[in-house]
């Protein structure tokens, strides 16, 4: 599935819900499916600066298909709602090539009106998470050239 197809799927899931109480619950449910990150990876180096809660991200370049290497993201947060946001971002970007990630237009955040329903500090956190995810992809893209 392409990044845009995944975004469209998420938009459809949110469109089925009539209010933001249900949408928050959906985000929290996404977070419950996120596997716990290893204690070794939950360190200062992987901590995302700019988030209100503690958020950790790692990435690896999977070259098992040498013709199409993909980035696999792992993330976690100590806050329930933020963990769901981490899960959403991973769902959209993980499993795609570094170029696809760097070039992606992440419109689903606006379409589901997520930023309108979060505090400014949480919104800054989303920006910081996406910046780090793109930085990982950009680093892998430069390695592959």
Regions found by a protein language model. Name each.
Residues 3-54, 61-65, 109-145:
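N-terminal intrinsically disordered, cationic/polar leader segments
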Residues 7, 75, 93, 104, ...:
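Functionally constrained cores in energy, signaling, and assembly domains
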Residues 61-80, 90-94:
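Conserved interaction-surface patches within small, structured recognition/assembly domains
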Residues 86:
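Primarily the active-site beta-strand->alpha-helix module of PP2C/PPM metal-dependent phosphatases
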Residues 95-112:
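Glycine-rich phosphate/pyrophosphate-binding loops
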